[in-house]
């Protein structure tokens, strides 16, 4: 579960970093910078927790990252306005919420640690906040 959460937050951070060059509005750029910082802080805590358990934190494989980059390039090819970029960020946050809820539901009645479940709940709240912020720029 923790490995999946780590991959999800790293993918969120990486995706927004790739969009930053296209953002024109300073308020939107500041909001995205704050979001990246939040992702990276959660990822670092997850990485440390995984290492303390003897696991290595791994990001998505290169093919998943490549397809994500291609998809993002296609989405912004004809429309790279801040409003459209905010829509993409909102869609990404919605996916993050859905993925984290699914992980939470799959593991909440198992022997997985309460700390792992707490990470999932934290990410859901973080992504819900990110979604609301993104909607304000659409």
Please place each PLM-identified region on the residue numbering.
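Alpha-helical scaffold segments that form or flank carboxylate-/histidine-based iron centers
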Residues: 1-5, 26-44, 82-89, 112-126
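Alpha-helical bundle segments that constitute or directly flank the non-heme di-iron/ferroxidase center
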Residues: 1-23, 84-111, 126
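Generic detector of short, locally flexible boundary/turn motifs and exposed helical patches
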Residues: 12, 23-25, 51-52, 59, ...
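N-terminal alpha-helical segment
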Residues: 12-13, 66, 70, 100, ...
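A structural signal for well-ordered alpha-helices, especially hydrophobic packing surfaces
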Residues: 13, 43, 47-50, 74, ...
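Carboxylate-rich helix-loop segments that flank metal/cofactor sites and access channels
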Residues: 48-98
């Amino acid at each position: 579960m923790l490995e999946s959460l780590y991959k999800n937050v790293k993918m969120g951070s990486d995706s927004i970093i790739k969009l930053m060059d296209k953002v024109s509005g300073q308020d939107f750029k500041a909001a995205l910078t704050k979001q990246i910082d939040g992702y990276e802080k959660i990822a670092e805590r997850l990485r440390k927790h995984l290492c303390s358990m003897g696991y290595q934190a791994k990001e998505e494989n290169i093919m998943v990252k490549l397809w994500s980059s291609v998809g993002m390039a296609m989405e912004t090819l004809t429309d790279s306005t801040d409003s459209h970029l905010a829509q993409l960020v909102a869609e990404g946050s919605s996916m993050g919420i859905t993925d984290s809820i699914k992980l939470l539901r799959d593991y909440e009645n198992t022997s997985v640690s309460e700390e792992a479940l707490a990470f999932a709940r934290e990410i859901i709240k973080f992504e819900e906040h990110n979604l609301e912020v993104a909607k304000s720029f659409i």
